[in-house]
Structures are given as structure tokens and as C-alpha cells.
């Protein structure tokens, strides 16, 4: 018996293919396109990876989550400990230098403010005061032009190669401090300001404090009252330019 299968016409919409083998007709109910059918929700949730679903997991499902949590916690703890140690060490090292620098800058600006207040009509003093305030702002005086990121000065300091250098040496060598020291000295000479007046009063104050510490209130009061008239006289002379 010779069988010659003859495919019959079919429609692409019915999903059925007919084949004739002799007098027998067979219906193939599974179209080839069924293997590639797509789900309408694949665009939202993604398609299932049939091949990947057969692979076996070599570690528990929570292992990766726990590992990530421990890594994050360890990183935070390390940053916290390192920050505390670094900040304290940096503060201990930089506080003295920063305080000395701020004191010198404040001294220069303060004297210029006093001169500008004593002579309100002088435009030169007003301009110098405004310029000094800009130069001695924290952003300017502590800027990258004069300091490394680690807090070391980048400008030359006299004596730093051969001997000991103290904070005062570093501060007075700062380009902005050196610049305004010259300007301030010129204005002091022009207006006849007595800078030793403040030094003498400081000596008197130190004597009063020392007598109080020694338990001699009467001596401390005598030292304070004996210098009061002289102090007032010098203040009047200094303001009468």
C-alpha cells in the first residue's frame, strides 16, 4: 500500500492543518506558531525564562540580602570611627594656628574700624576697611591659594627650614597679613596712633590679676586706681588728633 500524504489548504486563523494519507485525513491541532506565543503582560512584567528556571540555587535566598546589610553596616561604622578620630586630631592641630591667624586679622580690621569711625569723612579709610574685610573673610584667608587640603600652608615661612617655627611666624608670613600690616602701619603713622597705649594697659591688667590670685585685694585695688587717671588721660590724648 503506497501512501502519499497530501497537505490540504488551511487558513492561518483556524490554527489547524489537515493532511491526507490515503483515505485517512489527519488534523494537526498544534500550529507551529504556538511555540512562540507571547503573553500580553510580558511588556510589563517580563517574560518567563524557561531555560533559566531549571538552574539550581547554590546558596540560601536570604544570603545576598544579609551580605548587603552587613557590608553597609560595616561601612557606616568604619566611617563613623574614622571621622571621629580624624576630626579630633585635625582640631587639635589646627585650632591654635587658626585662632592665632584670626586674632591677627581681627586686630588689623579692628584698628581700621576705629580709624574709620574716628574720621567718618575720610573716603580712603572707608575704602581700606571694606577691602580688608573682604581679604580677611574665611573663604579668602583660608582659601586654597594659601593652604593645602591637609591644612599645611603653601607660602614660605622664614626659618621653617632651619629652626623651630611657631604659630606667630606662620601667621605673620601669611601674604594677606603681611600686606595689611604694611597698610596698617602707614595709616597709624599718618594719624599718629599710639599702639603702645594698649600694651601699657595690658601690663596693668596683668598686675591686677596677679595680685588677686595672690590674695591681696587691697594691692590689686591700689594698682587699678593708681593707673586709672593716667589711662583716661592717654585715651583723651590719643583721640585728639
Swiss-Prot record:
InterPro entries: Essential_protein_Yae1_N (IPR019191), Yae1-like (IPR038881). The keyword Electron transport does not apply. Keywords: Cytoplasm, Nucleus. Pfam families: Yae1_N. It comes from the Eukaryota. Residues 224-235 have a biased composition (Polar residues). One of its GO terms (cellular component) is nucleus. GO terms for biological process: protein maturation. It is found in: Cytoplasm; Nucleus. Residues 74-114 are annotated as: deca-GX3 motif. Residues 222-241 are annotated as: Disordered. May form a complex with LTO1. The complex LTO1:YAE1 may function as a target specific adapter that probably recruits apo-RPLI1 to the cytosolic iron-sulfur protein assembly (CIA) complex machinery. May be required for biogenesis of the large ribosomal subunit and initiation of translation. Belongs to the YAE1 family. This is Protein YAE1. It comes from Pyricularia oryzae (strain 70-15 / ATCC MYA-4617 / FGSC 8958) (Rice blast fungus).
Amino acid at each position: 500500500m503506497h501512501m502519499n500524504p497530501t497537505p490540504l489548504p488551511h487558513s492561518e486563523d483556524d490554527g489547524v492543518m489537515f493532511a491526507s494519507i490515503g483515505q485517512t485525513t489527519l488534523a494537526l491541532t498544534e500550529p507551529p506558531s504556538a511555540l512562540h506565543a507571547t503573553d500580553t503582560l510580558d511588556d510589563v512584567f517580563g517574560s518567563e525564562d524557561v531555560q533559566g528556571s531549571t538552574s539550581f540555587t547554590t546558596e540560601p535566598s536570604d544570603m545576598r540580602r544579609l551580605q548587603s546589610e552587613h557590608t553597609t553596616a560595616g561601612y557606616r561604622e568604619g566611617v563613623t570611627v574614622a571621622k571621629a578620630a580624624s576630626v579630633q586630631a585635625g582640631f587639635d592641630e589646627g585650632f591654635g594656628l587658626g585662632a592665632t591667624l584670626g586674632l591677627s586679622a581681627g586686630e588689623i580690621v579692628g584698628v581700621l574700624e576705629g580709624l574709620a569711625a574716628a574720621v567718618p569723612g575720610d573716603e580712603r579709610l572707608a575704602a581700606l576697611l571694606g577691602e580688608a574685610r573682604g581679604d580677611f573673610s574665611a573663604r579668602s584667608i583660608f582659601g586654597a591659594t594659601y593652604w593645602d587640603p591637609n591644612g599645611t600652608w603653601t607660602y614660605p615661612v622664614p626659618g621653617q627650614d632651619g629652626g623651630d617655627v611657631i604659630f606667630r611666624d606662620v601667621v605673620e608670613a601669611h601674604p594677606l597679613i603681611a600686606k595689611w600690616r604694611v597698610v596698617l602701619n602707614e595709616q597709624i603713622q599718618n594719624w599718629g596712633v599710639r599702639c603702645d597705649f594698649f600694651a601699657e594697659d595690658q601690663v596693668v591688667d596683668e598686675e591686677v590679676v596677679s595680685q588677686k590670685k595672690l590674695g591681696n585685694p587691697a594691692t590689686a585695688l591700689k594698682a587699678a586706681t593708681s593707673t586709672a587717671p593716667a589711662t583716661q588721660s592717654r585715651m583723651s590724648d590719643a583721640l585728639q588728633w
